[in-house]
Amino acid sequence: NIKMMDKKQQIWYRWKNDLPKLKREAVDILSRTYLEIGQKPSVEDIVTMANILVDDLANNTQFSTMTIEDVSRAFREGVRAGDEASVFLNVRTWNIWLRAEKKKVAKKVIEMHKKHELEYLENARLMGGTIKKAKQIK
């Protein structure tokens, strides 16, 4: 269920307005992911990687409009995809996962816009018929 995205949920907005919470959420995503794939980095490494992740998200126009939920889903699905990229968590791996998620989100948004366009055209057609009938009543 894709809804029109609130800009306040997008990474770029949160980076400008709530960076500490965004970084904490990145730490949570990375901690969960490291656990799921069996890597055991130090807390310092997780925090460093979280800073790199947030920087990647905020400064890559492809990812800056994503939400933290999109990012979390990308990591969750990336781990479970079972391909060679899911063996280790690193910058290259998460960029692969994020690009895949961004494509899925973009496809859903396009489908939603097409659906709304078809609904609009159908409503316009029905309204045109109603107006035509109303004119005939005169």
Residue ranges and their predicted role:
Residues 1-138:
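Charged interaction scaffolds used for protein-protein
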